[in-house]
Amino acid sequence: MKRSQLGFTLIEIIFVIFIIGMAVSVISIAVGGNAAADMTRKEAEEFMLQASYISEQSVLKGETQGLFVELRPAQDIDAEEQWCYQWRRVRDRQWQDLPELSPHCLPEGLVIEFVVDDELWEFDPELEYQDPVMGFFPSGDGSGKVEVSIYTDQLKGGQTSVTEELELDLAGELHWLSEEKRIEEDKRGR
């Protein structure tokens, strides 16, 4: 007399779980995001939020406010140099740190670059006093045309470089050019 099989064998269950696991891993690799692109976009968003806040505060408080940028040296042997920026305001004829915004450093491997009035701005560590890279005035105007690029350092990451571009125009308006382009492409794609 033969017994009828009422369930699955252990081998069959293990095989099905293996197939499902393989399918999930293939899908996650195919759909998985670009970490460098996500990090670059997050930093551009942070910069945009801070600059918009500073622009508004400059008008509301009647203060001139500026952006100071520096390349900080590596802190230990395994670390890399880091780009950091800090917003300051003019009080008593000198630049003072803003208490509401602490200095912000980009993650290692990211670079921030400025083109001020069509000239590439370069950080000079030898200077005792650095001028602000860009600023906002109480009138609502900006300090001039400034193009800001945040991107991955291709030499260190071995990854595809993703650049986020922002621009401050003469009227003090800040535009996230990369985001505007993405939105326009999404509209055309529909």
Regions found by a protein language model. Give the residues of each.
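N-terminal helix-rich module
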Residues: I14, V26-L49, Y53-E56, L60, ...
